[in-house]
């Protein structure tokens, strides 16, 4: 039984091997004509340059924090080493995602000349490289450190490193991509009246670069972090019930191993048998991964735990995933009521479009909240939480681990989106035939849905995983502190501080996008005004200027969100005590979850309302409704691609800070 744990790092290595195999097969595909290669090279150079500058900045911060951990904490050397390993692994996950995306995009565009089948294969397998790399690195790192240290508490540093880099990646990438996107749309579509991805737009390359550094690299680092901290939370809680269930720490690692093999097999399920069935092909892959994982979970549970109730908990986790996907698709799909309502409201102007979009976003929080609440209760009580609260909390953690059984496929779906988006942009800028653009538009339309759906999944898994992390924090501090009571003014003060943190964080992120977009808009206007021949297509815009503007803005403004995530919980714990920090975590998890849902779903609904009008409905392109929808989309962009997704990372970073520094916080506070 002891040797079984080596299955986990082995599974991680196998996942990385298949990621390399798929990457190699993609690179063998044709990259198109000279013009396509030039455009793709510009996107690749911009993406690579930004990532390198971002990682240099993050490296300095990581070294400083690792030194603080080294000198402040017991076993500081091991925890600091784990922190650096987590930071490097998270950065690697993001870089791999970006690297394959900027190579798969042009090959997808080239393959589109032969129809959707081959183009889908290249785009999805490009996404699968990121997905398999993310879960492979996460499981390899977590299990290897546990084997090396023999204590789950010492692996917390790895989770903190992953969380912090994810926050920087989400914040920086989100600011970059949406500043470029908003700037390109406001001047290009509204003022100049030129279509999306038009080579005459000076911000078009920055916009395409942003798809890679924001969506691919950002989501890769985000779900890497989620995978690590959720597995770690289950292991930490499992160590508390090891007297009853001797394999409670090993169990989540084995579930993760089985899910990797299910994901690898399911990649081969994704193929288009008939034209127009792209979404069905993608969901077939996710469904295959889910079914194979559950079959494996059944046998693993019987072998390791000897208690079928834990299998039912994994089923509950998978059901939560399915329901979150369904709800998110409903609120962001062009064929459903919320998006159609926003599109109709656009006919009377931007104001009614904004009002309808906000309404849809607020409404979209109801069902997910009920789903997560039901999942928590079912997972807790089904394993006997009423009799043994420790086992009940472990059940919640296992449900969140089960949610991540589809993480490899979910990351693949998310990364598929920017690959097809870039492919469409390359086809447009290279003036490829209309038939090619039709194929890339079809793939991109599906990609917009998958990006929205995966955000809903990420939020749900964050909420459930954060509860498990909170339970571990509470266990650590309650050993030497009074019980945490909601009628305590100290706890209530902490709840208020935690509740306001997501709003403060979002304000910082939205402000950063607004300032950077302002500079991009002015630069694009300057080029249209001062460079003759751009609109006629006889002069080439200075693409590098816009890339440089958003790069500087992203690197400058990503520091403050990270600072807030680390310093506020530490100050709360040190000055108000561990009970106040517990309240802060409670307020943060609840409000952060709701606000992230509202922003992601509302932003996705605004985006697809615009695309619905561009499909020819409610006036079509160039109409007043279209202009209003573009305004709504530019408001929704930083909602769904900057502030909303970054809230996931904020929630996990703050929880990891609380757990990691809990030995210093115990006994602290002036109240």
UniProtKB/Swiss-Prot annotation:
Instruction: List the coiled-coil residues.
Output: none
A single GO molecular-function term is:
diphosphate hydrolysis-driven proton transmembrane transporter activity
Cellular compartments per GO CC = plasma membrane
At which positions is Ca(2+) bound? Answer: 607, 633, 637
EC class, as a word, reads translocase
Q: Which NCBIfam families does its entry note?
A: PRK00733.1-2, PRK00733.2-1, PRK00733.3-4, PRK00733.3-5, V_PPase
Protein's job = Proton pump that utilizes the energy of pyrophosphate hydrolysis as the driving force for proton movement across the membrane. Generates a proton motive force.
The protein, known as = K(+)-insensitive pyrophosphate-energized proton pump
Origin species = Methanosarcina mazei (strain ATCC BAA-159 / DSM 3647 / Goe1 / Go1 / JCM 11833 / OCM 88) (Methanosarcina frisia)
């Amino acid at each position: 039984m002891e040797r079984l744990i080596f299955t986990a790092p082995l599974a991680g290595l196998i996942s990385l091997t298949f990621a390399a195999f798929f990457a190699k097969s993609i690179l063998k595909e044709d990259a198109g004509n000279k013009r396509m290669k030039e455009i793709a090279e510009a996107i690749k150079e911009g993406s690579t340059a930004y990532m390198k500058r971002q990682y240099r900045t993050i490296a300095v911060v990581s070294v400083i924090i690792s030194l603080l951990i080294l000198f402040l904490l017991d076993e500081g050397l091991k925890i600091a080493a784990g922190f650096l390993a987590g930071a490097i692994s998270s950065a690697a996950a993001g870089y791999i995602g970006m690297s394959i995306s900027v190579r798969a995009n042009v090959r997808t565009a080239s393959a589109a000349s032969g129809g959707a089948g081959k183009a889908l294969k290249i785009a999805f397998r490009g996404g699968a490289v990121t997905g398999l790399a993310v879960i492979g690195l996460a499981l390899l790192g977590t299990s290897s450190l546990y084997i090396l240290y023999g204590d789950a508490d010492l692996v917390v540093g790895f989770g903190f490193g992953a969380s912090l880099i994810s926050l920087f990646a989400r914040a920086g990438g989100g600011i970059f991509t949406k500043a470029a996107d908003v700037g390109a749309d406001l001047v290009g579509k509204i003022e100049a009246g030129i279509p999306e991805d038009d080579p005459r737009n000076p911000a078009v390359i920055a916009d395409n670069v942003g798809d890679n550094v924001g969506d691919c690299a950002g989501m890769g680092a985000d779900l890497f972090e989620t995978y690590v901290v959720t597995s770690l939370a289950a292991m930490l809680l499992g160590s508390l019930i090891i007297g009853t269930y001797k394999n409670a720490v090993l169990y989540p690692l084995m579930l993760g191993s089985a899910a990797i093999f299910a994901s690898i097999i399911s990649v081969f399920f994704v193929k288009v048998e008939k034209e127009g069935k792209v979404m069905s092909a993608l969901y077939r892959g996710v469904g295959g991964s889910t079914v194979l994982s559950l079959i494996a979970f059944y046998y693993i549970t019987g072998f390791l735990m000897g208690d079928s109730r834990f299998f039912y908990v994994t089923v509950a986790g998978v059901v939560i995933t399915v329901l979150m996907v369904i709800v998110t698709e409903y609120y962001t799909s062009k064929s459903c009521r919320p998006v159609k309502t926003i599109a109709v409201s656009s006919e009377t102007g931007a104001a009614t479009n904004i009002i309808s979009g906000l309404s849809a976003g607020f409404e979209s929080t109801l069902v997910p909240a009920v789903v997560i609440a039901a999942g928590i209760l079912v997972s807790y009580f089904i394993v006997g939480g009423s009799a043994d609260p420790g086992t009940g909390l472990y059940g919640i953690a296992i449900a969140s681990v089960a949610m991540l059984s589809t993480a490899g496929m979910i990351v693949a779906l998310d990364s598929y989106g920017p690959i097809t988006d870039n492919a469409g942009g390359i086809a447009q800028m290279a003036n490829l035939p209309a038939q090619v653009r039709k194929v890339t538009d079809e793939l991109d339309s599906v990609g917009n849905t998958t990006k929205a759906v995966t955000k809903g999944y990420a939020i749900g898994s964050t909420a459930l995983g954060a509860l498990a992390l909170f339970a571990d924090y509470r266990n650590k501090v309650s050993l030497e502190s009074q019980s945490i009571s909601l009628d305590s003014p100290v706890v209530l003060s902490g709840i208020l501080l935690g509740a306001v943190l997501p709003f403060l964080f979002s304000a910082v992120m939205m402000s950063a996008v607004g300032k950077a977009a302002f500079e991009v808009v002015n630069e694009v206007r300057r080029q249209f005004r001062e460079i003759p021949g751009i609109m006629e297509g006889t002069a080439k815009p200075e693409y590098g200027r816009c890339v440089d503007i958003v790069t500087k803005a992203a690197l400058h403004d990503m520091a403050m969100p990270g600072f807030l995530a680390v310093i506020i919980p530490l100050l709360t714990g040190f000055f108000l005590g561990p009970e106040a920090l517990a309240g802060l975590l409670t307020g943060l998890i609840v409000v952060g979850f709701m606000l992230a849902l509202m922003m992601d779903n509302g932003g996705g609904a605004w985006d697809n309302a615009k695309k619905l009008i561009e499909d020819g409905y409610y006036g079509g392109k160039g109409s007043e409704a279209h202009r209003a929808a573009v305004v709504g989309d530019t408001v929704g962009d930083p909602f769904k691609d900057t502030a909303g997704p970054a809230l996931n990372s904020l929630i996990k970073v703050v929880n990891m800070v609380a757990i990691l520094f809990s030995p210093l916080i115990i006994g602290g506070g002036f109240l």
